[in-house]
Amino acid sequence: MTAAAYKRILLKLSGEALMGDDAYGINEDVVSRIVSEIAEVTRLGVEVGVVIGGGNIFRGMKGAASGMDRATADYMGMLATVMNAMALADAMRRNGVEARVQSALRIDQVVEPYIRGRAIRHLEEGRVVIFAAGTGNPFFTTDTAAALRGSEIAAQIVLKATKVDGVYTADPKKDPAAQRFHRISFDEAIGRNLAVLDATAFALCRDQKLPINVFSIFKPGALKRVVMGEDEGTLVHS
């Protein structure tokens, strides 16, 4: 069997990815399919960390826009990510994948606190670690949490799972002539003003020379193809 291109990855999942076609919440069929994709990768011997968003339940920026205190709204968004992480971990266990949730906000009766050394040990022992509650601080996105946790656990790449199959020259929904980048450097992405991750997360990945692959979580087998080093999505590199 061909070896995977990466030994340890950080997968960034948006909360919206868990909704499927629903307007709100967690779609069990979608979660089951995502779990099966992750399970397939773990069977290759790849160590998987996951950062998950909470936008399917509550989005801090939206709460702040409606007049809520921004920090309060962000903390509510962090709690939403804990709910998503617990649902994902439960689905993994039901599918034979060992998983642990570590939260940047302490909720010790429910999930483990985030402890870097413990997270790395879980990964080394073949468990999927789902990092919840973002960075634990308001004003930082879960994209930034993905860049931070990816750097902390010495992941070899951040995989951003989205609804589109990569980074394009323009919005492919609006411009039928838009073309997908197969590979692009951090500097070129900045020069073209491409929104790969939010600015803080992008800068951290660039400074740490941590590559990013943007791909569609809705394409069957895409996660495995990325991990195997195939031409899937868009690779952003130093």
From Swiss-Prot:
UMP binds at residues 54, 74, 135-142. Its EC number is 2.7.4.22. One of its GO terms (molecular function) is ATP binding. Inhibited by UTP. ATP binds at residues 12-15, 55, 59, 162, 168, 171. Pathway: Pyrimidine metabolism; CTP biosynthesis via de novo pathway; UDP from UMP (UMPK route): step 1/1. Its main location: cytoplasm. The keyword Ubl conjugation does not apply. Keywords: ATP-binding, Cytoplasm, Kinase, Nucleotide-binding, Pyrimidine biosynthesis, Transferase. It catalyses: UMP + ATP = UDP + ADP. One of its GO terms (biological process) is 'de novo' CTP biosynthetic process. GO terms for cellular component: cytosol. It is found in: Cytoplasm. SUPFAM superfamilies: Carbamate kinase-like. Catalyzes the reversible phosphorylation of UMP to UDP. PANTHER family: URIDYLATE KINASE, URIDYLATE KINASE PUMPKIN, CHLOROPLASTIC. Belongs to the UMP kinase family. Homohexamer. This is Uridylate kinase. It comes from Azoarcus sp. (strain BH72). The lineage of its organism: Bacteria, Pseudomonadati, Pseudomonadota, Betaproteobacteria, Rhodocyclales. The gene is pyrH.
